[in-house]
């Protein structure tokens, strides 16, 4: 889009592990960041904002929420009507968090990794996405290793197995590191060409599930 962080407001919906990392990096890059996380706000009173306020101020609105009765279609026509003209919505949480039909009518831009009706995303939603990927945001080497380690830890607790701290030996845990906006823009394309990934999915939408099943894991970039 040619945007610079200092000129833009990033809205984050869901400030758990991933959302917190997004917040930390975005603030470091110079974005103005506004956050919404009602469960955390109720528990911690940490100054998070209501969803509609965040949506109204955001140039980019990104979702990092679980899917339950309270989040299904939380991004729908009412919310879209409060967003800025030309704003961009990003969803890498669960497809049903966003009402796809309403998004098509919204006039917004969107970048989606998750979709309603997977593995058969709406053709118009797919074709008109700024970026489209086949639900692979967590498909890094470390992401898969973390999920495996969590499963092992859960089984170990359930059955009393001596596996505290176990982690797949083939994968080194990712350690977040500072990275400037300039370095990110200059180098990330060499680590992961998301534009090429998006083109492949748009050209061959019927391969959605196959692309996931045969995805080559990448190391986390930062």
What do the predicted segments below correspond to?
Residues 1-9, 24:
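Phosphate-binding beta-alpha-beta segment of Rossmann-like dinucleotide-binding domains, i.e.
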Residues 8-11, 32:
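Residues that mark the start of a beta-strand
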Residues 13-16:
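Glycine-rich Rossmann-fold phosphate-binding loop(s) that bind the pyrophosphate
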Residues 23-27, 84:
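Surface-exposed amphipathic alpha-helices with a cationic face
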Residues 27-45:
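NAD(P)-binding Rossmann-fold cofactor-contacting core
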Residues 40-124:
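Rossmann-like adenosine-cofactor binding region
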Residues 86, 92-222:
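Rossmann-like dinucleotide-binding domain for NAD(H)/NADP(H)
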């Amino acid at each position: 889009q040619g945007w610079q962080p200092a000129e833009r407001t990033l809205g984050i919906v869901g400030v758990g592990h991933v959302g917190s990392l997004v917040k930390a990096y975005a603030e470091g890059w110079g974005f103005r960041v506004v956050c919404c996380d009602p469960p955390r706000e109720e528990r911690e009173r940490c100054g998070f904002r209501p969803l509609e306020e965040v949506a109204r101020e955001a140039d980019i609105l990104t979702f990092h929420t679980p899917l339950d009765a309270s989040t299904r279609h939380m991004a729908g026509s009412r919310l879209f009507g409060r967003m800025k003209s030309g704003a961009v919505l990003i969803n890498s949480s669960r497809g049903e968090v966003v009402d796809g039909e309403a998004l098509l009518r919204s006039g917004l831009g969107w970048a989606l990794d998750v979709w309603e009706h997977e593995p058969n995303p709406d053709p118009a939603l797919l074709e008109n996405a700024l970026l489209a990927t086949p639900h692979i945001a967590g498909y890094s080497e470390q992401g898969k290793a973390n999920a495996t380690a969590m499963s092992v830890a859960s089984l170990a607790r359930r059955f009393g197995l001596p596996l505290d701290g176990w982690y797949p030996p083939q994968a080194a845990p990712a350690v977040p590191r500072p990275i400037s906006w300039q370095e990110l823009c200059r180098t990330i394309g060499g680590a992961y060409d998301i534009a090429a990934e998006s083109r492949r999915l748009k050209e061959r939408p019927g391969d959605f599930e196959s692309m996931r099943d045969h995805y080559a894991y990448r190391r986390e970039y930062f």
